[in-house]
């Protein structure tokens, strides 16, 4: 019982999937009151013979990060102190570093990175293209109301293609010639009856989906030529592109849309639901009820889980594959105001980022619900959108008229190792 009070010892096995940091798989007797700090000291002493001392680790006990004393963690999990405990250790993900601040003339409500380019959308109705080194390339007028979402369709050495959506009820397709730095509107996509809040391009870049305040989900062609229109002329000559499909089911605004695969999408809404749509059936495949309006949602192709951002300051984790559709897998505490935006890493299975009205971005590990890995500070007003499409950069836009660019800590270390 002494260990339960943080006094006595606990038998543990230290395990890792990173073989170069492995220690002998034998029981170790450690004090029940240890935290991550003491475990790091203990583990680094064991690793001295491998020349790996000085490495910072995080520790997983029953699939959750240790964030306090070991005895408190075990008590919370109702784990017997008499049993040998497996503790998994992983090299700590390095802290992202602030790299740049991109100044705009109005709120930045949409950001999306692709390679060395950053696409931004603003409340002054303009789209902007920047390099990830902070050089402004182009300001693009066209919409007649604030931009709400942007996404890249394709990118090569000569051209970039992207889509933007706006409170003006339209989506617009664009083609940018990189060499001449000239942009052309390929099509104006009309069909929504209220502002278009969300957009996502399909994995094959042939279609894109939009979600609107009119509660409708619409699917559009992303091709330069849309044969259904009977012409391949540009919008200056041919006018409007119409949706390929309209799907109804939400009762309030669709705030998030993402392709899960070539025929499946997930949407999040202010109506407190996540819906998974089957485009082949042209209907809802799964519905997950939540207890709060959803401002954003992100699906991970690596772990097949969905994380949501809501008005109650929390993020929540769901599994659309389970029959228990209303059960939350985890709740993440740390923001102090509405959480407006969230996105999974597309290379790190357990990591995601969020941005909030509390002016902060946070980097999370989904196995650490009690605290984020890092706070990413810099914005002076509420954060409106965050993006981690480029694994090397976390990019966010806010009501302080700036885009903040953070370099991934892992990218920083890789650069140092190659010098």
From Swiss-Prot:
GO biological process, one term: maturation of 5.8S rRNA from tricistronic rRNA transcript (SSU-rRNA, 5.8S rRNA, LSU-rRNA)
Family label: Belongs to the WD repeat WDR12/YTM1 family.
Source species, domain of life: Eukaryota
Name of one Pfam family that matches: WD40
Protein name: Ribosome biogenesis protein WDR12 homolog
Subcellular compartments: Nucleus, Nucleolus; Nucleus, Nucleoplasm
Function of the protein: Required for maturation of ribosomal RNAs and formation of the large ribosomal subunit.
UniProt cross-references to SUPFAM superfamilies, sorted A to Z: WD40 repeat-like
Repeat region (WD), residues: 103-140, 142-184, 191-230, 249-287, 289-328, 334-374, 378-416
Gene Ontology molecular function: any one: ribonucleoprotein complex binding
Chain intervals for the UniProt region annotation (Ubiquitin-like (UBL) domain): 10-91
High-level lineage: Eukaryota, Metazoa, Ecdysozoa, Arthropoda, Hexapoda
CC annotations in GO: nucleoplasm; PeBoW complex; preribosome, large subunit precursor
PROSITE patterns: WD_REPEATS_1, WD_REPEATS_2, WD_REPEATS_REGION
Keywords, sorted A to Z: Nucleus, Repeat, Ribosome biogenesis, rRNA processing, WD repeat
Organism: Drosophila virilis (Fruit fly)
InterPro entries reported in the protein's UniProt record: G-protein_beta_WD-40_rep (IPR020472), NLE (IPR012972), WD40/YVTN_repeat-like_dom_sf (IPR015943), WD40_repeat_CS (IPR019775), WD40_repeat_dom_sf (IPR036322), WD40_rpt (IPR001680), WDR12/Ytm1 (IPR028599)
């Amino acid at each position: 019982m002494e260990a339960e009070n943080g006094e006595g010892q606990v038998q543990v096995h230290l395990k890792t999937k990173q073989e170069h940091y492995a220690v002998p798989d034998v029981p170790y007797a450690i004090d029940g009151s240890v935290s991550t700090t003491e475990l790091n000291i203990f583990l680094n002493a064991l690793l001295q013979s491998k020349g790996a001392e000085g490495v910072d680790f995080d520790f997983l006990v029953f699939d959750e990060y240790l964030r306090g004393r070991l005895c408190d963690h075990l008590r919370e999990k109702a784990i017997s102190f008499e049993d040998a405990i497996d503790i998994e250790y992983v090299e700590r993900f390095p802290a992202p570093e602030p790299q740049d601040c991109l100044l705009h003339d109005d709120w930045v409500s949409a950001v999306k990175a692709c390679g060395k380019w950053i696409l931004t959308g603003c409340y002054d109705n303009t789209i902007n293209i920047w390099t990830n080194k902070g050089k402004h390339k182009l300001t693009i007028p066209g919409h007649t109301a604030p931009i709400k979402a942007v996404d890249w369709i394709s990118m090569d050495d000569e051209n970039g293609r992207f889509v933007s959506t706006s409170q003006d009820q339209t989506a617009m397709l664009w083609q940018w010639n990189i060499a001449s730095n000239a942009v052309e509107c390929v099509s104006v996509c009309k069909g929504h009856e209220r502002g278009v809040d969300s957009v996502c391009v399909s994995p094959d870049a042939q279609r894109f989906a939009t979600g609107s305040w009119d509660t409708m989900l619409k699917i559009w062609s992303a091709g330069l030529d849309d044969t259904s229109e009977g012409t391949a002329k540009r919008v200056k000559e041919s006018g409007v592109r119409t949706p390929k499909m309209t799907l109804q089911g939400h009762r309030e605004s669709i705030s998030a849309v993402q392709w899960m695969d070539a025929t499946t999408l997930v949407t999040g809404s202010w109506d407190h639901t996540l819906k998974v749509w089957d485009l082949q059936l042209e209907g809802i495949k799964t519905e997950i009820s939540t207890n709060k309006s959803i401002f954003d949602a992100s699906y991970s192709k690596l772990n097949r889980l969905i994380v949501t951002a809501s008005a109650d300051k929390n993020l929540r984790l769901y599994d659309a594959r389970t029959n228990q559709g209303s059960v939350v897998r985890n709740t993440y505490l740390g923001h102090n105001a509405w959480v407006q935006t969230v996105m999974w890493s597309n290379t790190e299975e357990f990591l995601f980022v969020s941005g909030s009205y509390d002016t902060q971005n946070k980097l999370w590990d989904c196995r650490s619900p009690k605290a984020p890995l890092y706070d990413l500070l810099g914005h002076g007003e509420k954060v409106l959108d965050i993006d981690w499409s480029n694994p090397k950069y976390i990019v966010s836009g806010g009501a302080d008229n700036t885009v903040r660019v953070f370099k991934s800590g892992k990218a920083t270390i890789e650069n140092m190792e190659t010098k």
